[in-house]
């Protein structure tokens, strides 16, 4: 998560240098803010998955009931997650970002660095979103990558 804050700070600095193209900068800045919110929501969901995963593996419990099959528990938890407001907001942010990103491809030359930085942030957030959308791997790799 710290990476997103550092990258956002770099993006802000680069954006200041691109002030000749105000409309593009506003759209780029808005998109960066949306990506940051998407990352926050994704992180909240992945942390919830990690907690559930650990509890099933170490305590053999899911939702207050005895459970030894963590795959079954994760599937049930995923069914629960997709009904939450957090997940619904995440999907809305995701859809909005995916609609806006292609519009940013045609950037002014003075905003090339800002655009490239945004694409880098977006790629990292995309991976985090995929982990929030569908947990995969082992608990160890999942918690390390998220």
Provide a role label for each language-model segment:
Residues 6-8, 26, 51, 144:
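Intrinsically disordered, low-complexity regions enriched in small/polar residues
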Residues 60-146:
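Long, amphipathic, charge-rich alpha-helical segments that form helical bundles/coiled-coils
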Residues 18-82:
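Immediate post-signal-peptide N-terminus of mature secreted/exported proteins
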Residues 14-16, 56, 119:
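Extended aliphatic helical segments
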